[in-house]
Amino acid sequence: MERPNNRKLMKLKSILFFLAALAVTSCGTARYYGGASAGSIGTMAAFRPCSYISYIDRSGKQQYDDSLSAVSAQLVAMASEDAALPVSEWLPLDEAGQQEVVSFMDALAGASPKLVGVMPVPSVLDSLLEEAGYRYGLILFADGMVRDTRNLVREAVKEAAIGVALAVLTGAVVVSVPDRCVSALRAVILDAEQNRIVYDHAVVREDEDPLDLQDTRRLVRKVMKDFVGRGLP
């Protein structure tokens, strides 16, 4: 699949799109259900997965990584095929299409279910579905972070020192362990005919690796199970 244009993606906020949106939930999950299910919509296309993975280097600097994002997107595609999702065709995305998906995910981050229900389908994606002869289209968008091991050790030592200092002052031992990685996945189903979102399920998991196939499989099953209505492989 084509890889996103690094320069254009770097113009967007270098953040995890879903973390802010899901921080207020206890389970790291956000859902919107507009009546769509595998049994009710019949034929559905899916866009080739997109991914936005950032890397925290040894010094603690975090930035978007094009190569890691490409690997993550490929893993989502593999996990989706393993799960036997009810998809008739996978539609490729050119640079404009990938940019549209990233911008759309940015707009969805933090949106309430009420707002998701009235948000229009992006014009580029709507046109791609209509040209391919499909009313419904699935977006799978991965988001996440991986941390350099040396930075992880340094941050862990720093947090431990802070914990010891607080224990001396308060008598309570509290040590915060930095995340080695964070993985998130969002599944959005578009209705090109009615120009609206009919399904949206996003999940964030700390210490699950966006570059690990087994972790990615778990996320795919999680975000799609309400739509499919059955256990996925």
Question: What are the functions of these language-model segments?
Answer:
Residues 27-56, 127, 131-133, 144-233:
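C-terminal/domain-edge helix-coil "capping" segments
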Residues 17, 65-69, 209, 213:
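Flexible, glycine- and charge-enriched loops at secondary-structure boundaries
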Residues 58-146, 200-201:
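N-terminal segment of the mature soluble domain
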Residues 1-25:
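Sec-dependent bacterial lipoprotein signal peptides
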Residues 21-22, 108, 231:
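Prokaryotic Sec-type signal peptides and long signal-anchor helices
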Residues 8-13, 61, 114, 158, ...:
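Context-gated lysine
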